Amino acid sequence: MIDWQRAMGGDGHRGNRSDGILEAMASAGTKNPEVRGAAETAAKLLALEARLRELEDVMVAYSGGVDSAFLAGTAHRVLGKRMLAVLADSASLARRDLEQATAFAQSLGMPLEIIATEELDRPEYARNDADRCFHCKDVLFSVLEELAGKRGIAHIAYGMNADDTRDYRPGQRAAAQHAVLAPLAEAGLTKLEIRALAKAAGYPVWDRPAAPCLSSRVEYGRTVTREVLEQVERGEESLRQLGFRELRVRHHGELARVEIARDELARALTMEMMDAISAALREAGFKYVTLDCAGFRSGSMNAVLPVEVLARKGA
C-alpha cells in the first residue's frame, strides 16, 4: 500500500508533488500491459487533482464501484470537507453493494449522505426500454441538484471514465443535461488505470467486479418491479454463496440466464454444481435455469438493441 501522505509531500491533502506520486506509482508498479506506464498514469492523476482543486468543492454521485470510489476518495484527499459523497439507495441497489459502499466511505472518514431515490415510480424507467439508464440518472441528478443547493455545493460529479465514452451509456445524456461533471474522463483515465491507482492507494475496491444496478439484469421490454429486482438479487447472492465471484443472473421472465466468468465456468459445469445452481435459482423463483456458454459479458443485454440505438452511445 502506498503511503499517500509521504508520496504527496504533506498531510495527504492539497499536495501536488509529482515526484512523490511518480515514485509511489513506480514502486507499486503494474504488470498489465494495457496500462501504458506509471508516469503517464501519474500525470493523469495530477490532472484529476488539478481539476478538483479548480472546482473548490464537489458532490460526488457515489455507488461504491471502483470508479466512483476512486473519484470520491481522491476528492476527499484533495478537498477534505469541501466534498460530499452521496449514495442513492433504491430497490435497484443490492444490499451487499450498499453495505460495501458505506463501509468504504467510513474507512476513509469521507463525508457521506445516503438518500432515497424512487426511479421505479417513474413509468419511463419501469417500462425498461433502451433509455432506462437515462431516466435513472435523470432522477438521480435531479435529486443531487436539489441537495447540492441545500448544502451550498456548486459542482456535481460522477464516475464516468474515459472508456465509457466509447460505449452505449444513455446516462451520459442525463449528465450533460444536468451539467454533471466527469473528472475521471476529463483526465483521460481508463478503467485499467483507475484500478491501478486504486490498488496503489490501498483501496480494497480496486479489483471489485463491475456491479451495475440490478435493473440491468432485466431483459429490455420487461417491466422492472421490486419483486423482479429482489428475485435477481436473491439469485445472485445464492451463486456467490456457491463461491462464484463475477456473475450475472439475467432475468427473462420465468427463465434465468446465468453468466459466470469464463475462468470459473469449468467449476460450474460439474453435475454437482449444475444441480446446486439450478436449485438456487429455482429457490429464487425462476422455473427454468440456463447457463450461458459465452460466460460473463458486461452489457450483454444490449446485444438485442438496434444498431442505430447503440450508435447513439451517450448522445
Regions found by a protein language model. Name each.
Residues 230-315:
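Auxiliary Fe-S-binding modules of radical SAM enzymes
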Residues 24-200, 256, 275-286, 295, ...:
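ATP-dependent adenylation/nucleotidyltransferase module used to activate substrates
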Residues 185-239, 243-248, 253:
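Mid-to-C-terminal catalytic subdomains of enzymes
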